[in-house]
Amino acid sequence: MSTAHYVFPASFAQQRLWFLDQLEGASAVYNLKMALRLSGPLDQACLQRAVDAVVPRHESLRTSFAMRGTDVVQRVASQLDVPVQSLALEGASDAVLAAKLNELGAASFDLQHGPLLRVHLLRLGATSHVLLLVMHHIVSDAWSAGILYRDLAAYYSAFSTGATAQLPELPVQYADFAVWQRDWLAGAELERQLAFWREHLQGAPPLLDLPIDRPRPVLQTYNGNRLSRALPIELSARLQTLAAAEGVTLYMLLFAAFNLLLSRW
């Protein structure tokens, strides 16, 4: 029996990611990879039940994308199976584990057919596992990944103890936001915002001339690295205060500061 799909407009952010996927082809650039180290006994059957409960709860996890005429749309499946894929890595070194996590996280998604969520369980020992969730950014972000982990933990805890998970009903799904956004930006409001950005971006360079230490490659490789730095407590507190005063998250504040830095070039 075929699975029914419910069709909604894509948000503008989803439309951009769809366009990039169609332009550049299958890629892992927009894969979100979240690994969690689990210590102690693990009931894999309960973990699968938890996944089976979370997927129906969040429409985004059952969403794929398609073109309808000239518009990108979300196709929300009425039901979708997401198996927990197990892999035995007993005795593996940290380097082998890291390589396997990178390999699993680098597999591309098919936005048109989905699913856009993969769940991997890497067994390191009888009481040691790594749970890896891989999602495409078109249906998730770091904030929603935290919600997914929270709900998974709640369902797993309930199923493993024979209790009933007490999770609140979700009054709004992402598709509801997409519909609202399309309605809000219809007509005059969209034209007003487009006019603002056309004016402010007039004459902007097509590429930032950053003071990098080596030539920019002709083709973008997406190779990169990460640099971590701890902020002093006093500075962190001041940033939190400023973010609260402006009604934004700390991420939004720091991202604005980063973009301000880039604007120097």
Where are these regions (language model features)?
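Acyl-group handoff/entry surfaces in thioester-processing enzymes
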Residues: 2-78, 91-184, 192-211, 248
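Secondary-structure transition/capping motifs at alpha-helix termini
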Residues: 263-265
